[in-house]
Amino acid sequence: MSSVKLIVGLGNPGGQYEQTRHNAGFWFVEDVARQYNVQFRPETKFLGEAARIQSNGLDVWLLKPMTFMNRSGQSIQAIAKFYKIAPEEILVVHDELDLDPGVARLKTSGGHGGHNGLRDTIAALGTKDFKRLRLGIGHPGDRNQVVDYVLKAPSKTDRALIDDAIYDATRVLPDLLNDDMARAMNELHTKT
């Protein structure tokens, strides 16, 4: 395994999407930036907003692609290529329909599961072998309602549960940054 050098929060740019379920990945990296007291800055060469934190004397990049969800891979590929970050050193944080609000799960690899941001990331990186943090948002129950569901804000109760899961996930971030995925998974999966 490799320690994480790039943390990408998936979401859609623009105020109209800011509070939607599909932006749970943005919420996570924004929370990490607050904890490390850093600001996101527009980075046109990366098609997104980026911030840098330090872990064990090494740079770790935070990225919010500003390409819209279905083109997230372009932004991820641009920053990874520029800083020579391998796919296995990337953590992609995204909303997950198949998990209830309040649940967060780590994975070391996998398919896209119908998530367009992951689909584009896999295509852009040429591999599915990158780490993921899946933030549960619940499912509307009918697959025909998924698009409307992810592009709406969660209820106050669900948002509080998602925020709790984000908090729990940020607590295991030091393990991820120290290349201890097994410990991070164990801690997180027993909490949420």
Swiss-Prot record:
TRNA binds at Y17, F68, N70, N116. It catalyses: an N-acyl-L-alpha-aminoacyl-tRNA + H2O = an N-acyl-L-amino acid + a tRNA + H(+). Its EC number is 3.1.1.29. Keywords: Cytoplasm, Hydrolase, RNA-binding, tRNA-binding. GO terms for molecular function: peptidyl-tRNA hydrolase activity; tRNA binding. InterPro entries: Pept_tRNA_hydro, Pept_tRNA_hydro_CS, Pept_tRNA_hydro_sf. The keyword Cytoplasm applies. It comes from the Bacteria. Pfam families: Pept_tRNA_hydro. One of its GO terms (cellular component) is cytoplasm. Disulfide bonds: none annotated. The active site is at H22 (proton acceptor). GO terms for biological process: protein quality control for misfolded or incompletely synthesized proteins; rescue of stalled ribosome. The keyword Cytoplasm applies. NCBIfam families: pth. Belongs to the PTH family. Hydrolyzes ribosome-free peptidyl-tRNAs (with 1 or more amino acids incorporated), which drop off the ribosome during protein synthesis, or as a result of ribosome stalling. This is Peptidyl-tRNA hydrolase. It comes from Hydrogenovibrio crunogenus (strain DSM 25203 / XCL-2) (Thiomicrospira crunogena). The gene is pth.
